[in-house]
Amino acid sequence: MKPRAVALVAGGGFAGALCRHGIAVVLPGTFPWGTLVVNVAGAFLLGAIVYGTERLRSVPESTRLVVATGFLSSFTTYSTFAGETIALAPRLAALNVVGNYALGFVAVLVAREVIRWRS
């Protein structure tokens, strides 16, 4: 692994973790809105990067390392989603699971269409 790549991933990861924490603080409550927001936003952004790279060939490797591998890996979180879901009442837990997966999937589809529209 090259030192520059490590630095790019680490910098992105640091920023992603801080942003995730900030959103969780801004959106407190009994339902894990912060985790839902970051997971859906992260799915959209990753979808845009994946489809942008595929269709536009305009996402440089350094951007992919910082944003996708670094930032989005720390910004989105499966482990927090799983832990928060277990702590919810059964109906809210089911809503959280459906919301995270369905909205995340829709976010990727929307990102794909935005990239197609812009290309």
From Swiss-Prot:
It is found in: Cell membrane. Keywords: Cell membrane, Ion channel, Ion transport, Membrane, Transmembrane, Transmembrane helix, Transport. It holds the Pfam family CRCB. It catalyses: fluoride(in) = fluoride(out). GO terms for biological process: cellular detoxification of fluoride. InterPro entries: FluC (IPR003691). GO terms for molecular function: fluoride channel activity. It is a multi-pass membrane protein. GO terms for cellular component: plasma membrane. The chain crosses the membrane at residues 6-26, 31-51, 66-86, 91-111. Coiled coil: none annotated. Belongs to the fluoride channel Fluc/FEX (TC 1.A.43) family. Fluoride-specific ion channel. Important for reducing fluoride concentration in the cell, thus reducing its toxicity. This is Fluoride-specific ion channel FluC 1.
